[in-house]
Amino acid sequence: MPTLYQSLLKYNNSDVKALYFEGNSYTFKQLLVRVRQAAAYLKDKGIHKGDVVTTVLPNLPITVYLFYALDAIGAVQNIVHPLTPAEKILETMTETGSRHAILLETLYGENRQLFEGSEHTFFFVNPMYDKSPLHRRLFYLKYKRAKESERIFKADKFRAYPEEHCIEHRDERENSVYLHSGGTTGVPKVIALSDASLNNLAAKVDGIIEGDVKGRSMLAVLPSFHGFGLGMGIHAPLYNHAASALMMKFDCKKVVRWINQNKVNMIIGVPLLYQKLLKDGGFLDARLENLDYCFIGGDNVPPSLISEFNDVMRSHRSGAMLLEGYGLTETVTVCCVNTKAAFKDGSVGRPLRGIDITVRDSQLRSLPAAVTGEVYVKGDTLMNEYLSDPQATGMTLVDIDGESCVRTGDLGYLDGDGFLFLKGRMKRVFKISGINVYINRREIE
C-alpha cells in the first residue's frame, strides 16, 4: 500500500481542483508541486526521516502542503489544536519526542523569549499568506514578525525551493500521525495512526458515496487535529480525486457562497454546524441542488434535526440527505454510517466495507441482535497504539479470536439487518465521532 503522499501521485499531472481557500483554488498538479517544494525546504532545515514534528495550524493550504511533505520525507506528525498555548505546545513536544514545531506566527510576539530560549526548532506561518499581499502586510501591523535565526524559520519561504523528488521509503504500517483525544475512557491520550489506517479509510469512500467523486468538493471546516477533519475533510477527498474546501472557522456566509458557486458538494459536520445552517436565511435560499451528501456525527444527534434538514433538501430538489455515522479516533474516525441506499432512523448505520462491528458482554461473548452490550470494532483502520502507554493500549486494543479489536466503551446493539444503534457510554460522557465534545461549540461558533 502507498504512503499518504504516494496515494496522490496518480494525480501528479491533473488539472482537477484539489483545494479551495478563500477566493483561491489549487489543482492537484499545483498541490503536488507545493508538497515537493515544502519537502525540499524541510529537509534543508534539518527535518529527516523518523523525526517527530509538531504542527499547530488551522485549515490552510500550507497545512495540507506540509502534511503531505512531512509524510513524503518520512517524518511523524504530532498534530495539535492551533489555539494551544505556547507552554502547552512545548509540553506536548516533550511528551511525543518532537524536536521541531510548525506554528502560526500569531504566537511569536508574546512568546518570543520562550521560543528563542528553547533548543527546539520552530517554523512560523503567516495565516494570511494565501490571501493577498495586503492581507499579509496588515497581519504584521497586528502581530510581530518572527525574526529568523539558527532555530527560528519562516515556513512560507518554502515556495522559493526547487521540488524535492527524493522521497524516503517508509513502512505504511508504522506510526506516522499522532492525534490527541480523550481515549475510550476519557483520560487524555496520544493516538498513533499509520499511513495504512488513513489510506484504508479513504479507500472506503466508494462504499459511502455513490458514483465518481472526481471534481466534487468536501467542506473541510472541522479541524485537522482530529480524525474526522483530517481523515474525511482533507485526506479522503484528495485520495479520491476530489477537492477539499478549506475553512479556518465556520462561516455561514462563506459556506453558502461556496455552495452557490458549486465549490461545496459534500459536508461533514457536527450537530451545531447544521443547526446554524438551518437558521441562516442565505442557506435556505441557496442552490442546494449543488449538494450531494451531508454527513453528521455527534452526541445525541436530534432526530428532528435530521428530518428538518432532509425536508429542506427535498423542497430544493437536492439529492443530499443528512446521514448519521459513528466512529472514534482509535479507528481514525468513521467506522459505521448510514448511506442513501441503506438508511434507518435512529441508527448510525452499517459498518464500512472491511470493518466488523460486534456487540459483546463483559466476558467478550458476542450478543445476539437487539441485545445491548459494549461495541467492539475490528478492521484495517485501527490505531497502532496509545503512544508510550502500553497498559492503556492493552485495555483498548483487545484480542478476540486472534484479531485486534477496539473496545469502544460505547453501549449499543445491532439489529437483524446489521444497523448499529447507540445507547450511551459505559464510563463517561458520550463522545462525538472521533472528536471530543468541546468541538461542538468551540470549533463552530
Language model regions located:
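Conserved AMP-binding/adenylate-forming
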Residues: 21-24, 39-84, 221, 436
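Conserved AMP-binding A3 loop
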Residues: 27-29, 167, 176-200, 338
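Structural core segment of the AMP-binding/adenylate-forming
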Residues: 44-45, 72-158
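AMP-binding/adenylate-forming catalytic core of the ANL superfamily
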Residues: 63, 84, 92, 101-106, ...
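Conserved pre-ATP/AMP-binding loop-to-beta segment of ANL
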Residues: 144-180, 187, 210-217
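Conserved AMP-binding/adenylation subdomain of ANL enzymes
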Residues: 199-217, 225-266, 276, 280
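Gly/Ser/Thr-rich phosphate-binding loop
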Residues: 265-269, 278-344, 356
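Conserved ATP/PPi-binding loop(s) of AMP-dependent carboxylate-activating enzymes
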Residues: 343, 350-354, 365-397, 435-438
